[in-house]
């Protein structure tokens, strides 16, 4: 299996500004946490080599500015994604309410071949904050995920490295499954299109 080619997995991380997207990425890739990250401008990415079911893969994690007007990044930013991670702050109801619009935005821009089965993962971040300040319960978050077809849900703390590794293991596994299904589908896509074009040419003659 070691002779199989390496795979690049593109993972898009979406969510409101301040929910901890950059912190989660840095905790996962660099095992570091800083309380003084500057707001991400546009988009940035980090990579990490991981082993998923005996496959050597490179995770390319894309962090975005959590602003509604970053469509200027364009379709190219979303296209080719193998998994989308939706992040909210369990202490901020607005960031939770925005998950639907982030999910819709991704599906519109990325235009995955099979949107109903495209892999999403939801992360409820900042669980290190004292329980009394928490506003989004585990039950409420899980209900949302179930309503969207059973999206995997993890409660994380980038600050204390809680569940970060476990969440990204599932993200990597789901992204790899998506990448492999896209490769399989792609084997048939071009011949079908060429056949249609040839038929049209024949009719024109």
Curated annotation (Swiss-Prot):
Domain of life of the organism encoding this protein: Eukaryota
Q: What GO molecular-function term can you cite, just one? A: GTPase activity
**A single Gene Ontology CC term:** fungal-type vacuole membrane
CDD domains reported for this sequence: Rab7
Biological processes per GO annotation: regulation of vacuole fusion, non-autophagic
Q: How is its activity regulated?
A: Rab activation is generally mediated by a guanine exchange factor (GEF), while inactivation through hydrolysis of bound GTP is catalyzed by a GTPase activating protein (GAP).
Lipid attachment in record (S-geranylgeranyl cysteine) = 203, 205
Where does the UniProt annotation locate this protein? Vacuole
**Mutant lacking the gene: phenotype:** Exhibits defects in mycelial growth and production of conidia, and consequently fails to cause disease in rice and barley. Shows impairment in autophagy, breached cell wall integrity, and higher sensitivity to both calcium and heavy metal stress.
Q: What broad class describes the main subcellular location of this protein? A: other
Ranges spanned by the short sequence motif Effector region, renumbered to the chain: 37-45
User: Is the keyword Nucleotide-binding assigned to this protein?
Assistant: yes
Q: What is the effect of changing residue 67 to L?
A: Constitutively in the GTP-bound conformation. Reduces pathogenicity and produces more appressoria-forming single-septum conidia
Its annotated function is as follows: Ypt/Rab-type GTPases are key regulators of membrane trafficking and intracellular vesicular transport. They act as molecular switches that convert between GTP-bound and GDP-bound states, and regulate virtually all steps of membrane traffic from the formation of the transport vesicle at the donor membrane to its fusion at the target membrane. In the GDP-bound state, Ypt proteins are predominantly cytosolic, solubilized through the interaction with a GDP dissociation inhibitor (GDI).
Q: What is this protein called?
A: Ypt/Rab-type GTPase ypt7
The species this protein was found in: Pyricularia oryzae (strain 70-15 / ATCC MYA-4617 / FGSC 8958) (Rice blast fungus)
Source gene? YPT7
